[in-house]
Amino acid sequence: MGIVFNYIDPVAFNLGPLSVRWYGIIIAVGILLGYFVAQRALVKAGLHKDTLVDIIFYSALFGFIAARIYFVIFQWPYYAENPSEIIKIWHGGIAIHGGLIGGFIAGVIVCKVKNLNPFQIGDIVAPSIILAQGIGRWGNFMNHEAHGGPVSRAFLEQLHLPNFIIENMYINGQYYHPTFLYESIWDVAGFIILVNIRKHLKLGETFFLYLTWYSIGRFFIEGLRTDSLMLTSNIRVAQLVSILLILISISLIVYRRIKYNPPLYSKVGALPWPTKKVK
């Protein structure tokens, strides 16, 4: 079968000397959609409609910074020799786990300052986070990055993928696993599940199940990728972090049920920062 190659330009348009890339546009769309989804849950929980503004702003800002720092740390031999590249984020190089860590810390701090319950806020935003991640992976597709190992065109056709995906997985003379798509589908499925089971879960468990679901998918999909950050020659950083997140999340669900028996997410109104008992 002949190849009809419809290459997608990573640059959406130019504003003078500034190139606006599809990656940034798609990330922004993911954040906005996530915001609107979380906003509905926020109002339903009885919280002020402006509550999410500061949380999203600081979590996104510090999440982005942490994502870059995380990437630089695990690529330190290169950046030690090229320190000027550290701030050149437009050359690529961020890591989602770093973003999650930075965003989590910032979110908890904002909750403390605003006297909000971090478990309740976590449950509200968890489906939005994984939805934004699922959308954001299409930014990797537009950049022709974060793909898996080599495959044949016949393999991709057997997946019944649209031609524009198949054709844009042809990179430098070789077809590759569309790992962006695998993770996007996994994340969107996680979003659907979390939204539908949240009302049946206890406070805090939606967020922990988000971490568990995302980490399970990331562990297996990461094994297909060719651009993984490596801790050693055999250990991928993302897989190790995924295992830790799964263990920590499940342990916290069990511990909190035994120790505190928190209420159902759907049975509480607006909650303050926890004091004696973590609810």
Swiss-Prot record:
Q: Look up the record and report any one GO term of the cellular component aspect.
A: plasma membrane
The Gene Ontology biological process terms listed for this entry are:
lipoprotein biosynthetic process
Report the EC code(s) recorded for this entry: 2.5.1.145
- List cystine links: none
Pfam families the record matches: LGT (PF01790)
Where a 1,2-diacyl-sn-glycero-3-phospho-(1'-sn-glycerol) binds, per the record, is at: 137
Q: In what pathway does it function? A: Protein modification; lipoprotein biosynthesis (diacylglyceryl transfer)
The record ties this protein, via NCBIfam families, to:
lgt (TIGR00544)
Query: What protein name is recorded for this chain?
Result: Phosphatidylglycerol--prolipoprotein diacylglyceryl transferase
